[in-house]
């Protein structure tokens, strides 16, 4: 059966996450239904990242096995038509070897977190960013973030329901930058614990508002204790930006 790699963009606001759940609207479920309408097949759409409810993607990657060969642009365009009116877009489709697995072949996942640092409410980015009214020091956040790079026990930044076998992860990138009112947090690793990115962002917010120092952040990491984490950032600001292979 030919295998296709899909690069997908979506607004996660109306979905209960990526993974199919009974009686709930999910991104994976919407894609499977669209394939059913396109080619009449019941397929499993395997994603690189199982994003939570309300989390977005600009570069999610998935693979799917179909019973016959289709031109890649036909798959892309047919899915575009069948997905309407869902806020999901298949940006590209390409045939790949059977050995390709969207989840297990990935060498790095890249996430973006958007903070809008202003007092007025968000009109256009209400469900696409975290509004923080108090002034944040993005440079202090960036400098503190470097303390989290490398291989560590990230239990402090791990959800209680996380099913990962080990809390050990290697964080390759965690950059914080400001452009006007927007603060962007960009992070990369082979894989992340459940809620790790949102937990790190919430803790960095404590640094930005001056309540924590870089030493405080590092101490929270080394404690390997969930109760030492800052507030978890809301899902609305998080994007799965890209996946490397």
Curated annotation (Swiss-Prot):
Q: Which cysteines are joined by disulfide bonds?
A: none
An individual GO BP term: tRNA pseudouridine synthesis
Entry keyword set: Isomerase, tRNA processing
Residues reported to bind substrate: 111
| GO molecular function list | RNA binding; tRNA pseudouridine(38-40) synthase activity
Q: Give the reaction(s) catalysed.
A: uridine(38/39/40) in tRNA = pseudouridine(38/39/40) in tRNA
- The annotated active site, in chain numbering, is 52 (nucleophile)
**What EC numbers are recorded for this enzyme?**
5.4.99.12
The UniProt subunit note reads as follows: Homodimer.
Family the entry assigns: Belongs to the tRNA pseudouridine synthase TruA family.
Classification via PANTHER family: PSEUDOURIDYLATE SYNTHASE (PTHR11142), TRNA PSEUDOURIDINE SYNTHASE-LIKE 1 (PTHR11142:SF0)
Give a short account of what the protein does.
Formation of pseudouridine at positions 38, 39 and 40 in the anticodon stem and loop of transfer RNAs.
* Listed name of the protein: tRNA pseudouridine synthase A
According to the entry, what is the taxonomic lineage of the organism?
Bacteria, Pseudomonadati, Pseudomonadota, Alphaproteobacteria, Hyphomicrobiales
Report which gene this protein is encoded by. Answer: truA
């Amino acid at each position: 059966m030919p295998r296709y790699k899909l690069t997908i963009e979506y607004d996660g606001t109306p979905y209960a996450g990526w993974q199919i759940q009974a009686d709930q609207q999910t991104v994976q479920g919407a894609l499977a239904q669209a394939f059913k309408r396109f080619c009449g097949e019941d397929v499993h759409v395997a994603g690189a990242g199982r994003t939570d409810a309300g989390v977005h993607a600009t570069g999610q990657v998935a693979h799917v096995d179909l019973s016959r060969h289709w031109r890649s642009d036909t798959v892309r365009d047919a899915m575009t038509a069948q997905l309407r009116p869902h806020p999901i877009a298949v940006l590209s489709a390409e045939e790949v070897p059977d050995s390709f697995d969207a989840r297990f072949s990935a060498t790095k996942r890249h996430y973006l977190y958007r903070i809008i640092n202003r007092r007025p409410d968000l009109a256009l980015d209400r469900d696409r960013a975290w509004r923080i009214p108090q002034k944040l020091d993005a440079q202090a956040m960036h400098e503190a973030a470097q303390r989290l790079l490398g291989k560590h026990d990230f239990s402090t930044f791990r959800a209680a329901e996380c099913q990962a076998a080990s809390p050990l992860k290697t964080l390759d990138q965690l950059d914080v930058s400001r452009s006007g009112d927007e603060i962007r947090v960009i992070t990369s690793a082979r894989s992340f614990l459940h809620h790790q990115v949102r937990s790190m962002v919430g803790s960095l917010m404590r640094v930005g508002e001056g309540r924590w120092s870089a030493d405080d952040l590092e101490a929270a990491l080394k404690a390997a204790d969930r109760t030492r984490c800052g507030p978890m950032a809301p899902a609305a600001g998080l994007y799965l930006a890209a996946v490397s292979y």
